[in-house]
Amino acid sequence: WKMAPEGLTVHTSRMPFFADRFDSPFDEMESHLPRVIDEVNSAQPDIIAYGCTASSAKGNPIDYEKQLTQNTGKPTVTAAAALVEALKTFSAKKIVMITPYPQSTNDKERVFFQGNGVEVIEDESIIIDDAQLKFKNMNKIPTDLLIDRSVSLGQAENVDAVILSCCDMPTLDAIPIIEDAIGKPVTSSTQALFWRAIRTAGILDPIEGVGSLLIRT
């Protein structure tokens, strides 16, 4: 909502995620897609955004978007594809990736990005609570800590951009501060997903205050 231009409404539904109950929680979460699709389609949206990076970071992200679009009947974009497309917009080939994930998830996302032409120079998991190892409390990462780690790693000369991966991690206040500090583009799952959704919907309004990506058309 913070990024929404005047006249745009945002409607949500949620897929339940029970990492402490299932060995493959992302697969179990995706099993709820038919219900969630019905719920969001009841609002007659122009476009649907799939807000989970880890579960959408697979293979060719555009192919996965096409698959979801067939299932939903509406143009559908994903967080993982949005990050890849945002990096293309920045002409960024070498990145630092900051996440609140367990290292095993970072490793999977590193493979995903490298498979899509992006070299992950360094990744870091910010873990402040053991519950994060079960994908809980991702939204508890302090903004000051996120800024500090992003600036520390992102200022390296061989880094083109910084990504903050995880739709549940608060990032919008941090992005402009990090960009100002390192003089390089910064994007996050939430920011990139919103950018891809509104641009796909034909909304070209520049949006100030949440990073350089949303100023671009």
Put a short name on every predicted segment.
Residues 1-35, 103-142:
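N-terminal glycine-rich anion-binding loop in soluble enzyme alpha/beta folds
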Residues 30-44, 145-159:
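Short, well-structured alpha-helical segments in soluble
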